[in-house]
Amino acid sequence: SVVSVKNLINKAIEWGHKAVAITDHGVVQAFPDAMNASKGKDIKVIYGVEAYLVDDDLDIVQNPNERDFNQRFVVFDIETTGFSVTGDNITEIGAVLLEDGQIKDRFSTFVNPRMDIPYEVQELTNITNDMVEDAPPIEEALKKFMDFARDSILVAHNADFDTGFIAQKCSQVGLDYKHEKIDTLLLARVLMPDMKRFGLDRLAKALAINLSGHHRAVNDAEATAQIFLRFISMMKKDGVEKLSDINKVYGKIDHTKLRPSHATIYAQNYLGLRHLYELISDSHLNHFYRQPLMRKSLVKQKREGLI
């Protein structure tokens, strides 16, 4: 912060606040100043941290079945008006059906988002308001996509984003969503460990796969399908025959290669403050990779006294 802790606390007192929370970013450097500035004054300091949280117990594939790679996979991509699953809407869905290790069918539709597409998103995706004006609404487009994806495992690059949108919109329009998912981004991290960045365009280039019209769902889905087929061949060479073999052969994801999430954690009492110090010390001493990475498993162990 550009504001000194002393001035911050004095201003909080001036405004009549009874408590103020201090959340340093990954560190506790402001804690001593906060303690000294609040000593003898009618205000409580709540000590906390904005942590770089990583899931160090993450399987590559969640809840894998025992079937081989000849089963149905629907590799898909979406374009949206923004990043919020609740505040933004889908503008395009593109998908490729894989079965018996081959491309069997394709699906593509624009979606009327019932809102203006921000200018910067139009520049990125080349999808304009005019292009979606007469497109089917989400209720119609999503039903067609879910029919296309029936009895299939969904595959996407950075799958949490795409499946998060699909699941939320299914809930919104009253459609069932019970699909398992595979993330080609996580697969890339174990199958192509020499790469430092795993964007779809970089991955396609590294594998000599054509990706024209990047950030259009139909094109990204096609490229992701080709990447996934290539990954299947690579995994088979490593002895992976069934979906459930992936976690057995490759183990857990290296959490230092995951993008951390920001989590705000507060100490509720003295025990919580001690646990907070232990978590922060561990992140700096044992798991520093570009940032002090706080492990989710350790947070669970030190959960008492924290909110």
Language-model-detected regions and their locations in the chain:
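Phosphodiester-processing cores and adjacent nucleic acid-binding clamps
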Residues: 1-80, 86-89, 96-103, 107, ...
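Conserved catalytic alpha/beta cores of large enzymes that bind or transform nucleotide phosphates
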Residues: 138
